[in-house]
Regions:
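Conserved beta-alpha-beta core of the PfkB/ribokinase-like small-molecule kinase fold
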Residues: 1-46, 66-67
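Conserved phosphate-binding/catalytic region of the ribokinase-like
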Residues: 10, 36-159
């Protein structure tokens, strides 16, 4: 809970921000915390519908090693799995995922390609020994995706 008084306070402030956001991205646990005082135990689809009822155009819900799904305001759903790497640490992946996804979005890519790029960057981050110093640039991420697809096939991360 860091510097928050309690989880209810976190839920209040997270939900205030989420109601105004165009893009909401977080782990299932973060969504559960945000929605705690609204309705507990929502499914991913219910969460996406809730936030898109306010302002969100894209809702991305991450499930760690199980992958992630993006829900768009036009009713589309895109899912991705993580690239198979040997994780050296349990931190840094979320930052890599978020920056990779947003990079693709601002490049005008399709949502599934943004998910793939974010997933690749997250996988690259958790297999490294440190955090922000290891954040790969776009060329390195593209090379990683190409290399992984050559080894495992085109659909390696796509569901």
């Amino acid at each position: 809970e860091y510097n928050w008084k309690n989880s209810d306070e976190i839920s209040i402030y997270y939900s205030i921000v989420a109601k105004e956001a165009d893009i909401i991205m977080g782990s299932r646990e973060e969504f559960d915390l945000t929605e705690k005082l609204i309705k507990e135990g929502m499914t991913d689809e219910e969460s996406a519908s809730l936030w898109q009822g306010y302002n969100a155009k894209i809702v991305v819900i991450k499930h760690g090693m199980k992958g992630s799904t993006a829900y768009t305001c036009d009713g589309q759903k895109f899912s991705i799995k993580p690239f198979p790497v040997e994780a050296r640490k349990g931190f840094g992946g979320g930052d890599g995922y978020g920056s990779g996804f947003l990079y693709g979005l601002y490049q005008g890519w399709e949502v599934i390609d943004c998910l793939e790029f974010g997933s690749a960057e997250a996988s690259m981050m958790v297999r490294s020994n440190n955090c922000s110093d290891s954040l790969p640039g776009p060329d390195a991420v593209h090379a990683f995706i190409k290399e992984e697809k050559e080894k495992f096939g085109e659909m390696i991360a796509r569901v």
